[in-house]
Each structure stands twice: as C-alpha cells, then as structure tokens.
Amino acid sequence: MSLITYLIRTHVAPKAALALLAIEVFNLFNRGMPWRGELVWTVDWVGTALVLIGPVLAGAAAIDAGRLSRAGSEYLMPGGGLVSRAYVITWLAATVPAIAVHLVTVTVILLVSNSASQISPWPSAVAVLAQVCGIAFYAALGAVCGRLAGSIAGPPIAVLAGVVLFWQFGTSPGQFSFLMFGRATSSVLGLQYNTNYFLVQTLCLAVLILALMTLPVRVIAGVRRPPHTVTAVSIVAIVAALVLFPSTKAERFVPVTVAPTSCTGENPRVCVYPDHERFLDDAHRAAAQLRAAGAALGVEDLLPTELRERTPGAGPAPDARGRFQIPVESFSFHSPGLTMNDLATQMILPFHCPLLYGDRPPSMEFAEDLNRASYTLLKAGGATGDPMMPPESDMSKDELRETIESFRNCRFR
C-alpha cells in the first residue's frame, strides 16, 4: 500500500478536501460572480473563502493529529518513523489536498474572470502565495490542537481557535492583519496589491507554521502541554501580537494608474476600462438614449458627447468630458446590465466640480435639483422601473436647461 493511499484511507483531512471544494464552489458563484474581468478583485474574492476553509481544515487536522497523540499509536504510520515525523506527514496530508483544491479554484476563477487588466499580475501571484501559506497555517494550528487536546476535544478547540484568530487578526483594514486574505466586495479598479504587505504576511505565516510544527509537547502531571519555558514564551508572543498588530498601519492596496481605453461610438463616445468591456455596449446604448431624450428637451448641447468610466473614489475630473461609474449591483450576472436609470444622474452630475469632493456634502437643494433633472431626462427617454424616488414634479425645458448650465458652471443652490 502506498503512503498516499494509506493516508487517504486512514486520515480525515484528505477527505475533508471535498468539503473545502464545496466551499470554494459556493464562493465562486456567490452574489452572481461580480468580480469577472478584474484581476485583483478576482484574486481577493477567492481569498475570502479562507474564512470558512481555515477553521474546517483546522478541525480535520486536529482529528488526525489527536489520534497520534494517544499512547501506542505510532503503528499508524508505516515504516515506524518517529512521532515528530508522523505529525509532519499528518500535517502534509491536511495541507497538500487543501492547497491543491484552492489552486485549482484559483485557476478556474481566473479563466472565468478572463481579465484584460492593464496592471502587472505578479502582485496577485504573491497574494495567492499568501493564501497558500494561510491554508498551511490553519492545518498546523489544527495539528497542534490535536496534539495537545486529543482527537475529541482537539477539533472543536481548533475550529474555535481558527475563528477567533481570524476575527482578531484578519478583519482590520488599514492595519497589518496576517490572516486577511480577501475582503473586496466591490470593484477595486485603480488599486493594485501592495507586494511588500503580502511578502511580510507570507513571512509571518511561514514563521508561525515552523513554530507550530516544531512545538515540543511533554506529558506534565498527566496533561499534554509544552514545557513551561515554551508556554511562557508563547504567552509573551501572543500578548505582543495583540498589542503590536492593531497599531501597525499597513495597506493591502496601493493606487495604480489605469485608463478607460475600450471605446465605442461617436456622439456619444463611451469608454470603459478593459476589465469592464462587457458593459460597453449597454453603456453606449443608454448614453445614446439619454442624448436623444436631451435633444427632445432642447438640452442635448449641454450633455457630454463623451463618457468615460471613472474608478471608485476618483477625484475631480480634469476635463469637461462626462464620467460614469458602474453601480455595484450591475456586476452580478443576475443584473439586466446598464440602463438609462444607471447613467441619467451621472450624465448631469458635474464630476469636474471640486465642491462635490469636499468634506461637506452638497446641499439638499442640490440633491433635489439633480433628482428632478434626472427624472425629467428619464421620463423624456421613456425609461421604466426608475429606482429613484420620483420628485413631486419634473422640470420644464427652460428650468432643465438652467439647472444643467448651473451644474456645468459649478453653481449649486
């Protein structure tokens, strides 16, 4: 019997890879696969699965390691190797199948995403490496819990430890979180992975894995535990981590320059980022319908002849060309695509005005004027299913023209 066959037959963790695969598949289709087209968002999305994969894997590894903690169980490993070697093989039996499942998922999700991103793929590769180290860390954590607490108490302790560690060291944006592998729930276009962040994260995880796998365990007063010196050092290290990590400022992403180079049409000309090229036809169709509505209302000359997609959080537009941002809900494959309702407000909104980006938001009167102007344009275009709150009345042609002109000149009520 080969070692691989033996491990599959006698260990729980390799079989748990099927459960991990189910988690990965669920994560793949969750929320309508909104990440399609964006490289960084795609990689970050697949990393969110570790929130569930980690504790499940830790629990499975604890079962197998716990069985080896029983006296006389060395016979479970062929070849009669040392117990330390047996634990390493048991850890590998949990780690390798889980990593294989994850890497297959990463490959599939990247093929589905079919990203045409303008940014370098290497930082994303480093982020995937950190995810792989995260999987290995959770398996090592489970193995230690099994060694210390056995095959009955060890698994629930390992699962709980995985959850607690994630909430403590994996949920703090803006700080270094060594268990944060993905949290992007909306477009991160215009951002790139911070390679230094993920290299440090990978190094921290590698050190922790080494420490967990080489942890000495002794039977002291009938209880399996590390020596007193190791216990004291571990307590100091945990306290230091609780104090140090929350105060260490670090960003997972850094800004990167991208340009909306995928364009179509003339008057209006619509340009999107290559990552979002699937929205190009819908955006052009909606913009053309809105310009036709503007012509019927006598304001076509005030509407932009070119619309360019903007990144989330972008500052004032440096030119007079129109801007638009794809709504979050439109990224799902359940969405009907971009419509006039999505672009009407953005065709009127003066993205070049610094007043829109200050600490104080524009007045309620500005919001009311914008709502009425957008509603008037949509009504003239025959839009249906308007998601906005309909105003008490739409605008006359003269009032609409005056409002849009004041917006273009950054004059707000």
Segments from the language model and where they lie:
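Acidic/histidine-rich, surface-exposed loop or edge segments in extracytoplasmic proteins
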Residues: T261-E277
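Extended repeat-based interaction scaffolds and adjacent low-complexity, acidic/S/T/P-biased segments
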Residues: Y273-H284, R291, G298-R413
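Central hydrophobic cores of alpha-helical transmembrane segments
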Residues: L20-E24, A153-F166, H228-A237
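Helix-loop-helix units of permease transmembrane domains in multi-pass membrane transporters
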Residues: G59-P97
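Aromatic- and glycine-rich beta-strand/loop motifs that create alpha-glucan
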Residues: M1-A17
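Membrane-embedded alpha-helical segments of integral membrane proteins
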Residues: L160-I220
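Internal/C-terminal transmembrane anchor helices
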Residues: I220-V254
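Secretory targeting signals
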Residues: E24-V56, W91-A153, V159
